[in-house]
C-alpha cells in the first residue's frame, strides 16, 4: 500500500495493534519507522527498510515492544496480569493480538485479533485453546523512552 495503511475492512493481525495504538493518540507507524532508522541493527529480520510494510510485520512490532514497553507474565492462567489493551505475541513473531476487556466464565480474557479470513468475530474466547505459545506480553504506556522517541520524530 502506498501509505503503508491497508484499506478499511482489510488487514492482518498487526493492523489491530497499530490501529488501537493510533486511536490512543500515538502514531505507531512513525515511532516504529524512527526506531528502525535509529536502531536498524535491532530489527534482525529487516534487510531493506520499507516504511510501507515494516510497521505491519509481527517481528517488527515484537522488537519495538521489547525495546520500549514493560513485559508481563506469559502464563494466561495468571489472569490478574492480563489487562484490556495488553498486547500478546505468539510463537515469537508469528502472531500478535490484543487482550479484550471481555472475559470468559473462568476469568480468562478474550483476544481481539485478525486471525484468518474464516474468522467471524474479531473478539474471541481463544486464549486458552490456542495451540500457539504466548512468547510476549506487553503493556503500551507512555514512558520516558516513548516520550524521547516521539520528540525525535
Regions found by a protein language model. Give the residues of each.
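Homeobox/homeodomain signature
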Residues: 2, 18, 51, 72, ...
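Short regulatory "switch" loops immediately downstream of catalytic or recognition motifs
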Residues: 27, 101-103, 140-144
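A structural signal for short, hydrophobic beta-strand segments that form beta-sheets
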Residues: 28-29, 99, 134-136
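Low-complexity, Gly/Ser/Thr/Pro-rich intrinsically disordered linker/tail segments
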Residues: 107-153
Amino acid at each position: 500500500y502506498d501509505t503503508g495503511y491497508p484499506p478499511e475492512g482489510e488487514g492482518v493481525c498487526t493492523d489491530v495493534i497499530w490501529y488501537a495504538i493510533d486511536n490512543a493518540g500515538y502514531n505507531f507507524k512513525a515511532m516504529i519507522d524512527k526506531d528502525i532508522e535509529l536502531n536498524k541493527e535491532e530489527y534482525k529480520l529487516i534487510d531493506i527498510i520499507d516504511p510501507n510494510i515494516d510497521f505491519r510485520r509481527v517481528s517488527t512490532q515484537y522488537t519495538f515492544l521489547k525495546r520500549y514497553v514493560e513485559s508481563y507474565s506469559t502464563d494466561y492462567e495468571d489472569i490478574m496480569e492480563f489487562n484490556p489493551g495488553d498486547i500478546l505475541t505468539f510463537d515469537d513473531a508469528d502472531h500478535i493480538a490484543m487482550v479484550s476487556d471481555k472475559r470468559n466464565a473462568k476469568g480468562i480474557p478474550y483476544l481481539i485479533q485478525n486471525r484468518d479470513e474464516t474468522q467471524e468475530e474479531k473478539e474471541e474466547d481463544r486464549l486458552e485453546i490456542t495451540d500457539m505459545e504466548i512468547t510476549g506480553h506487553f503493556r503500551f504506556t507512555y514512558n520516558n523512552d516513548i516520550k524521547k522517541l516521539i520528540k525525535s520524530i
